[in-house]
A protein has these predicted regions:
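Short glycine/proline- and aromatic-enriched beta-strand/turn motifs that initiate or cap beta-hairpins
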Residues: 20-64, 78-80, 163
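Short loop/turn motifs that connect adjacent beta-strands in outer-membrane beta-barrel proteins
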Residues: 20-30, 61-72, 97-103, 139
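Hydrophobic, lipid-facing positions within transmembrane beta-strands of outer-membrane proteins
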Residues: 52-56, 72, 86-92, 126-130, ...
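Predominantly the C-terminal beta-signal and adjacent terminal strand-loop region
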Residues: 24-29, 44, 135-164
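Residues on the lipid-exposed face of transmembrane beta-strands in outer-membrane beta-barrel proteins
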Residues: 54-60, 90-96, 107-109, 130-136
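Transmembrane beta-strand segments that form the barrel wall of outer-membrane beta-barrel proteins
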Residues: 32-43, 69-81, 104-113, 146-150
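Cleavable N-terminal export/targeting peptides
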Residues: 1-28
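Solvent-exposed loop/turn segments connecting transmembrane beta-strands
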Residues: 42-52, 78-89, 117-123, 154-161
């Protein structure tokens, strides 16, 4: 699938899914979809894998669990890199609200397929991420995140990648 077709599909999914689900159900929409893009392998010393990536993430507000350590919820998502690498994941995130600002750390094990991109040493990879979100409208946020993906030395090699 070409990157232009993927971007179009991603935009249509992001904009039509909430409208379609709200028209079918009078209940509150408890599903949160995040669409994101960034730079894949930002600290690429060999200059062979740095590229863009585009992804989508889902969480359900009904599954938030309040604890003394914060508000936790499961997340599921995936991204496609500009070199046809994919990462599909599911894991947990915490959310700490500071007024209109949210700090959201997460940990998500997942499946990585390199495509024409960087070899990470194993199909099983772990993503740790810190995200800062700012509420800009009633149902919209804008944010910045930084993530690291590696296999914890369980693979043949473990170069890891950093994304922002």
């Amino acid at each position: 699938m070409s990157l232009k077709k993927f971007n179009l599909l991603l935009l249509l999914t992001a904009f039509l899914t909430p409208a379609y689900s709200e028209s079918l159900s009078p209940l509150k929409n408890d599903h949160v979809y995040s669409v994101y893009s960034g730079t894949f392998d930002t600290i690429d010393k060999e200059n062979d894998a740095k590229t863009s990536f585009y992804g989508i993430q889902h969480s359900n507000t009904n599954l938030f669990k309040e604890t003394i350590l914060g508000k936790f919820s499961p997340v599921t998502g995936g991204f496609l890199s500009g070199k046809n690498g994919i990462y599909l994941y599911t894991g947990v995130q915490a959310e700490y609200d500071l007024g209109p600002l949210s700090i959201v750390p997460s940990f998500t094990p997942g499946y990585y397929e390199r495509g024409e991109g960087k070899e990470l040493g194993s199909p099983l990879e772990f993503k740790s991420e810190i995200k800062i979100d700012l509420d800009i409208l009633k149902n919209s946020k804008i944010g910045f995140s930084y993530s690291h993906i590696s296999n914890n030395d369980w693979g043949n090699i473990n170069p890891g990648i950093n994304n922002k």
